[in-house]
């Protein structure tokens, strides 16, 4: 074979566009090098086999060629175990390399846009600030906004993150080598060395184990989360602040003040014990210590680098008296450098930071040599020292130095402190109830058990105990393991706050909160650990955050908060939290419960009603969006998603989870990471400070249409998932759900409890499974039937369509709903899904369910096109359409292989090689899809 066709998988459309030429060249280059690696290490026959499978899969997809399907079956049926593994790995790495090329091209296009002096784009802080200034918002109002705002992506360790650290590191190396070719005029010799390095990296990838050999521990997940601080957060977050300040300065006649730190990173990794028995009090302490060790290591490195560069001599410059005083307390420098006061100051900081690290994190991180310096009491003391340096530089003609690395370090300290990230605690309300029940029964004056109490009796007892000063827990009583474990966690939380500050552990989330009782039960346990106090001196060192997850809970959450705010004791405690209450909304469980349309609509309505309740009581609202990477779990473009929130529901406050493989996709590359963070900031600024109210639908007709669509979509979804006899069997046999449980990609079990019921399955593997078999029903099912029924009942199709078309044009919520569904439909593939359906042993069940899925898919596409006016999927998003076209030739063969492997495995071939190959296909398809869980 003279032409390496694997290197020629490029976009089929728009190939004449010059802007995409570098992308095509990168894909060809990487494809050729991987093909050469396969030839060299596995032989020409293996390369030919991979190419034959790819071409046959393409024919099956694009031409719906039945003969191609049979041919593919024949090829796959006759693969040896060794061939199967090699083929899966080949397509997995083609997917990975195409992702690298695509990410690089995004950065390339953005840089070209900036070099050309083009207007700033949507999602940039530059455009967001220009828009608010143009609307008459002055700099003082902006400063006030930043002083009150909080924008916080929260990293979670949910089990769809399948890439190993080794693979991520080589991704970055390959991307760096491609950037070198792109941005540097290389000599022929340098180009040759660059290609050799690329080939070496790709060959190393081929010879690196893709899968983890053992299941991740929570400690592993903590370490995996920390790598993104090195990749992106530590450098890019200060860059964003500097950019905002520089933009504000251009709009002022004087230097812009240092704005408050509003963009911060949060984490659940090591604090989320809902359904994870491996998160203990020791693990939570380990997470806090690792966080602190990492950020202090960073400060120590930065202070050392800056100090080495600060060679300013007193013979040529003057310094302030406060800097001279600070320098006098530092350890001595060599006599040859005694005239360099800034170096003396930074040496003093360096020794104090080492002492601080040894005090806060003595057992983790780097082991520094002991010194006699006094540790910093807190990060504010370190900031104070840096401010002395900055003031001295500015007052003595060294302003440029004050605006560089020192400015970024000072901002980093303000953002990350000595704790790095705010760690959330989370536990299920049922566990709280179980612990409180035991405490009640140990202290009961009668023979009644806690579950026997009425709701009113529980509330009365809980409030009474919250106001009492003495604890319920007694050293003379024996408690169950669960109760002891929960109490140890909360006592450790108090210790972590004492060592690292309240900001290190500021939030307590109650999963499956359904009423005020669940909030009071959690409050009582927090009181037992000294984290909360009711009564005259009411206070709390944590935010108590109810998480509303099911459709019924979303519908009732505003009433719950109304009842909670009517309790004077709770309101008094809330004043110690700046009168701010956070509420978390669960996109994932509500979707599994009620489907895509109803989940989105009920969350939107809940936000509207919560905003009304909070405004009525004068309480500040912060919404925490518990979403995943896929549309079925609340994912989708962040900019459009935030702007689609109801007016008044953002108000400068937003937290949102970043989960699974999305963390790697968003934050491995620093430029892409910065752009994603900027998008959150820009959308929050615009949503809060611009008149979004004017563009939201306020007519009763819009809401009535959505109510009817939601009700119909809910019925269609529930009929399929919960009312179809043996639907669980269809799900388990037509997806790799059982095999996902054996893949070492997370520390948590895939189900909350041993059960085959859909209700007990965690949402992440539920969505992950539907993504892997390319059906993706959590992202669209029910919409088509809903519109079809609504149009039929209305009688006048044209009038109804005109109204929904207007909703699409003018209502951000409806527009985002359809846009996200459009994306999922484009990624789905019912041809491939039909092959997974063939794994279902009950032919009648298979025929019934898959016919329902296919019919609904066709209805969704039909009405999506009718409302949007489009004639093809992703018509208004050519960049994403191109991306999917690039990736599908790599993903499809892995799906076909996965079906064959599942068939073999479930037929009794339990060879380790088959099991590993199945796991490789799960990894490969997830890599290709990029947001699968």
From Swiss-Prot:
Superkingdom as given in the UniProt entry: Bacteria
GO MF annotation, one: magnesium ion binding
GO BP field: carbon fixation; oxaloacetate metabolic process; tricarboxylic acid cycle
Name this polypeptide is given: Phosphoenolpyruvate carboxylase
Reactions catalysed, as given in the entry: oxaloacetate + phosphate = phosphoenolpyruvate + hydrogencarbonate
Homology family: Belongs to the PEPCase type 1 family.
Active site (UniProt): 158, 592
Biological source species: Nitrosomonas eutropha (strain DSM 101675 / C91 / Nm57)
Keyword hit for Lyase: yes
One Pfam family this sequence matches: PEPcase
EC annotation from Swiss-Prot or TrEMBL: 4.1.1.31
InterPro entries membership: PEP_COase, PEP_COase_bac/pln-type, PEP_COase_Lys_AS, PEPCASE_His_AS, Pyrv/PenolPyrv_kinase-like_dom
Function: Forms oxaloacetate, a four-carbon dicarboxylic acid source for the tricarboxylic acid cycle.
Gene Ontology CC annotation, any one: cytosol
Keywords of the record: Carbon dioxide fixation, Lyase, Magnesium
Cofactor(s) required, per the database record: Mg(2+)
């Amino acid at each position: 074979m003279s032409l390496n066709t694997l290197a020629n998988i490029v976009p089929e459309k728009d190939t004449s566009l010059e802007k995409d030429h570098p992308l095509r060249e990168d894909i060809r280059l990487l494809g050729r090098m991987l093909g050469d690696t396969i030839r060299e290490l596995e032989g020409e026959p293996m390369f030919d086999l991979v190419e034959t499978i790819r071409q046959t899969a393409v024919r099956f997809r694009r031409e719906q060629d039945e003969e191609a399907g049979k041919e593919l079956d024949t090829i796959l049926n006759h693969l040896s175990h060794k061939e199967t593994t090699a083929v899966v790995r080949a397509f997995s790495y083609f997917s990975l390399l195409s992702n690298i090329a695509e990410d690089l091209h995004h950065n390339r296009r953005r840089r070209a846009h900036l070099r050309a002096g083009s207007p700033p784009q949507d999602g940039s802080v530059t455009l967001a600030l220009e828009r608010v200034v143009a609307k008459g918002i002055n700099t003082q109002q902006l400063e006030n906004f930043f002083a009150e705002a909080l924008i916080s992506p929260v990293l979670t360790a949910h089990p769809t993150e399948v890439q190993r650290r080794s693979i991520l590191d080589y991704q970055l190396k390959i991307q760096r080598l491609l950037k070198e070719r792109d941005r540097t005029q290389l000599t022929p010799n340098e180009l040759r060395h660059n290609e050799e390095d690329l080939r070496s990296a790709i060959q190393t990838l081929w010879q690196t184990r893709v899968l983890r050999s053992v299941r991740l521990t929570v400690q592993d997940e903590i370490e995996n989360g920390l790598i993104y601080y090195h990749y992106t957060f530590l450098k890019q977050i200060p860059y964003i602040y500097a950019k905002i300040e520089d933009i504000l300065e251009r709009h002022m006649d004087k230097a812009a003040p240092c704005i408050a730190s509003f963009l911060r990173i949060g984490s659940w990794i090591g604090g989320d014990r809902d359904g994870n028995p491996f998160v203990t009090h020791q693990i939570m302490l380990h997470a806090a210590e690792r966080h602190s060790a990492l950020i202090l290591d960073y400060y120590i490195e930065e202070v050392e680098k800056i100090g080495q560069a600060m060679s300013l001599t007193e013979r040529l410059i003057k310094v302030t008296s406060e800097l001279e005083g600070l320098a006098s307390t530092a350890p001595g420098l060599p006599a040859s450098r005694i005239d360099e006061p800034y170096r003396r100051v930074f040496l003093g900081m360096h020794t104090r930071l080492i002492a601080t690290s040894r005090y806060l994190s003595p057992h983790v991180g780097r082991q520094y040599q002991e010194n006699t310096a006094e540790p910093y009491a807190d990060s504010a003391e370190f900031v104070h020292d840096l401010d002395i340096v900055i003031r001295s530089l500015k007052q003595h003609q060294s302003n440029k130095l004050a605006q560089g690395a020192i400015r970024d370090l000072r901002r980093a300290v303000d953002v990350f402190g000595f704790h790095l990230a705010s760690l959330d605690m989370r536990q299920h309300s049922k566990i709280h109830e179980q612990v409180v029940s035991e405490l009640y029964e140990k202290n009961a004056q009668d023979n009644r058990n806690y579950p026997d109490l009425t709701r009113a009796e529980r509330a009365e007892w809980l409030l009474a105990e919250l106001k009492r000063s003495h604890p319920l827990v007694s050293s003379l009583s024996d408690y169950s393991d669960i109760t002891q474990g929960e109490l140890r966690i909360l006592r450790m939380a108090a210790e972590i706050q004492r060592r690292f500050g309240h900001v290190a552990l500021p939030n307590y989330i109650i999963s499956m909160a359904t009423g005020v009782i669940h909030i009071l039960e959690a409050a009582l346990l927090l009181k037992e650990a000294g984290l909360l106090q009711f009564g005259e001196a009411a206070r709390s060192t944590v935010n108590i955050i109810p998480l509303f997850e099911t459709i019924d809970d979303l519908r009732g959450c505003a009433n719950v908060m109304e009842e909670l705010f009517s309790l004077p004791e709770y309101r008094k405690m809330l004043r110690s939290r700046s009168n701010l209450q956070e509420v978390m909304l669960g996109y994932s469980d509500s979707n599994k419960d009620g489907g895509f349309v109803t989940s989105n609509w009920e969350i939107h309505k809940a936000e509207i009603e919560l905003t009304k309740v909070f405004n009525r009581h004068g309480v500040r609202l912060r919404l925490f969006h518990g979403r995943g990477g896929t549309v079925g779990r609340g994912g989708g473009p962040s900019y459009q998603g935030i702007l689609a929130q109801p007016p008044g529901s953002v108000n400068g406050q937003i937290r949102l989870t970043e989960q699974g493989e999305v963390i790697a996709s968003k934050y491995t590359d620093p430029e892409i990471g910065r752009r994603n963070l900027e998008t959150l900031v820009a959308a929050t600024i615009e949503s809060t400070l611009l008149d979004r109210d004017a563009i939201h639908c306020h007519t009763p007709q819009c809401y009535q249409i959505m109510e009817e669509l939601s009700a119909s979509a809910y019925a269609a979804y529930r009929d399929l998932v919960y009312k179809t006899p043996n639907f669980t069997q269809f799900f388990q046999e037509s997806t790799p759900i059982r095999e996902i449980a054996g893949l070492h990609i997370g520390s948590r079990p895939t189900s909350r409890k041993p059960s085959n019921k859909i209700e007990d399955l965690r949402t992440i593997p539920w969505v992950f499974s539907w993504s892997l078999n390319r059906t993706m029903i959590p992202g669209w099912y029910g919409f088509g039937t809903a519109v079809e029924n609504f149009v039929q009942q209305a009688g006048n199709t044209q009038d109804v369509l005109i109204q929904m078309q207007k909703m699409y044009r003018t209502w951000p919520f409806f527009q985002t709903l359809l846009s996200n569904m459009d994306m999922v439909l484009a990624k789905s593939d019912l041809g491939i899904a039909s092959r997974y359906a063939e794994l279902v042993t009950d032919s009648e069940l298979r025929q019934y369910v898959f016919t329902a899925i296919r019919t609904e898919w066709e209805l969704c596409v039909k009405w999506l096109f009718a409302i949007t006016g489009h004639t093809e999927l992703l018509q208004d998003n050519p960049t994403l359409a191109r991306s999917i076209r690039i990736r599908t030739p790599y993903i499809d063969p892995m799906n076909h292989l996965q079906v064959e492997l599942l068939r073999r495995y479930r037929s009794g071939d339990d060879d380790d090689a088959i099991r590993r190959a199945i796991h490789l296909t799960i990894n490969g398809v997830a890599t290709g899809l990029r947001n699968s869980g």
